[in-house]
């Protein structure tokens, strides 16, 4: 749906990803673009991720669960600052995000700058309305980021640390060239149970960011 000014009334998720400490280090943008393309395979993608400027990439999604998956995967990597803007966009959307505009894009820029700041407690920030809901999402994301960091520090990072609990342990073990027991231990070390429990909660909160929680929507209709 589009309003009279040409802005979408549907919520969109604009994710800006900036390489951390890129000065003097190899450009990892091609790597992360290939990684995101493989991970999402078009799922929830409205505008594909692409380089915007320098070592920064940006994409537009409409699926909160896909957003959570991308954010957590990049947090495990540890080499990126992430800014998520939630809100309307100006339509029609172009083929590349650097040519797009709208509230969600402004919020994504503000969020990634916040995530890059020295005062940031986690390399991820969220901007959306209502502000209180965005703050709750950011807080939960921060706790997830801390958990992911602890898991990686204990040996849960790398390819094994990114393995998904939804796949068969035998298949994952075969792909990694290790035993099923090693996969199970690796996932436990990487705090997989805690992450699996938190993922749907964060996705739900993201889905409510633009519209507000169910109770608020019922009050508006009354």
Where are the predicted features?
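Regulatory and interdomain segments flanking nucleotide-handling catalytic cores
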Residues: 1-222
């Amino acid at each position: 749906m589009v309003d009279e000014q040409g802005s979408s009334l549907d919520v969109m998720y604009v994710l800006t990803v900036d390489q951390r400490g890129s000065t003097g280090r190899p450009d990892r943008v091609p790597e992360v673009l290939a990684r995101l393309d493989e991970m999402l395979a078009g799922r929830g993608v409205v505008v594909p991720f692409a380089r915007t400027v320098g070592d920064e990439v940006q994409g537009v999604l409409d699926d909160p669960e896909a957003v959570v998956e991308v954010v957590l995967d990049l947090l495990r990597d540890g080499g990126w600052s992430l800014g998520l803007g939630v809100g309307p966009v100006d339509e029609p959307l172009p083929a590349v995000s650097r040519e797009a505009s709208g509230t969600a894009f402004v919020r994504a820029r503000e969020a990634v700058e916040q995530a890059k700041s020295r005062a940031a407690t986690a390399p991820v920030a969220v901007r959306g309305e209502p502000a209180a809901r965005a703050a709750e999402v950011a807080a939960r994301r921060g706790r997830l980021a801390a958990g992911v960091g602890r898991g990686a520090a204990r040996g849960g990072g790398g390819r094994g640390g990114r393995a998904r609990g939804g796949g068969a342990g035998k298949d994952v073990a075969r792909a990694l060239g290790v035993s099923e027991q090693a996969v199970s231990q690796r996932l436990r070390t990487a705090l997989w149970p805690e992450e699996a429990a938190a993922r749907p909660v964060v996705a739900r909160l993201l889905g409510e960011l633009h519209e507000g929680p169910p109770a608020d929507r019922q009050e508006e209709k009354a």
